Amino acid sequence: MKKLFLLMAMMVTTIAAQAQHDEGDITIQPRVGLSYSNITDGDKWKLNIAYGVEFEYYLAEQFSLAGGVLFTNQGCKYDVYSDINKVTGEGIKLNLYYGTLPITANYYILPGLALKAGIQPAFRVKANVVQGSEKLDFDKMVAAFYGNDVKMNKFDLSIPVGLSYEFKGVTLDARYNIGLTKLTSDGDNLYNKVFVVTLGYKLGSH
């Protein structure tokens, strides 16, 4: 039994050493995964691909700053109803394509396990509404329906909070982005709500 505990202790020490970084280390991390998004009045959450790259600088063994670029397809799904209970058509997808610039402070509570929070400016590069084989430009639809009374914001600001775990350079990152910017210029309180889960591999100092 003593040998078993000794072996387990050695394994834990080895894993911790593999995930340890030193002050001054710099890593670059390609990332790919999934985003799960909605907006505050959306009927259903929408699943899409997220991908990008992140740079991380270690100010100390337990503290680092990270910044990067992540491309996400956000938005939501709606059901089409003819009355309260009956669905009469295919679901509608609202696709909001963003280039995001997440900046986070990371605190390693254990070797490889980090809590993170920060700020994320994002820029919408495209938006469309899809139903079946039909695809329409979302900004043109809003302009045709509302005229100049309503404008869609192309800039979005959010607060990312989450955690990550690294093992042998492979990192699993999960975060939730709290939307701060209204999607429209009118009085509606419409905000993005996004979960992002990605896998990455840290290149550089280990």
Listing of model-derived features with the role each one plays in the protein:
Residues 35-54, 184:
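Surface-exposed strand-loop-strand hairpins of Gram-negative outer-membrane beta-barrel proteins
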Residues 41-42, 73-97, 125-153, 182-188:
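Flexible, solvent-exposed loop segments that connect beta-strands
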Residues 84-118:
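Helix-adjacent hinge/juxtasegments
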Residues 1-28, 199-206:
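Bacterial Sec-dependent N-terminal signal peptides
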Residues 62-65, 113-115, 169-174:
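Repeated loop/turn-to-beta-strand initiation elements of outer-membrane beta-barrel proteins
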Residues 28, 47-53, 99-103, 157-161, ...:
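Hydrophobic, lipid-facing positions within transmembrane beta-strands of outer-membrane proteins
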Residues 34-38, 71-75, 121-125, 167-169, ...:
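Transmembrane beta-strands of outer-membrane beta-barrel pores
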Residues 21-23, 60, 110, 122, ...:
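Outer-membrane beta-barrel channels and translocator barrels
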